[in-house]
């Protein structure tokens, strides 16, 4: 299987050498690194080429690497039911540079790109309707970025008196925290209930 994927990677690299930066096979899947501005051309080739026939776009997501100048890996997962193979195509971008939309190549990319924008803030140029899809339209920030606070910025709740959803600053009430003072990880030398049975 890995040999056929490596051959496919060589075929893709040989045909699209100006658009593809490289490839490797890992965990039974072919991983291709492409130029961001050529992503539509690369995916169209993968869909239409007789040796590829990746007719199904399964997902688009991103990975956040805040320490890199090109902070985001935008990842496209494709499936070829004709070849019984999967491929992962990755492009790199930053917060300001838009990745070309691939809705014209795979119509299912519409909501995938919206989700990636909503969760990571990755921009897609020429998208027909790039707006939030999972969070509220007034949501502040991008929740899957590594620099997004775990508690969020605001708390959303329904106010029965006002009969509407209200936004409030996050309040963390300490008295509801459950601290385990009997934890063996604290270096204590006492016996926990039930430990006495283990000594017999």
From Swiss-Prot:
- On whether NAD is a keyword of this UniProt record, the answer is yes
Supply one GO CC term from the record. Answer: plasma membrane
Q: Which residues cross the membrane?
A: none
Under the heading Pfam families, the entry gives:
Complex1_30kDa
Superkingdom of origin organism: Bacteria
Q: What class of enzyme is it?
A: translocase
* PANTHER family assigned: NADH DEHYDROGENASE [UBIQUINONE] IRON-SULFUR PROTEIN 3, MITOCHONDRIAL, NADH DEHYDROGENASE UBIQUINONE IRON-SULFUR PROTEIN 3
The entry describes its oligomerization and partners as: NDH-1 is composed of 14 different subunits. Subunits NuoB, C, D, E, F, and G constitute the peripheral sector of the complex.
Q: Which family does it belong to?
A: Belongs to the complex I 30 kDa subunit family.
Return the protein name.
Answer: NADH-quinone oxidoreductase subunit C
Q: Which organism is it from?
A: Parvibaculum lavamentivorans (strain DS-1 / DSM 13023 / NCIMB 13966)
The encoding gene is nuoC
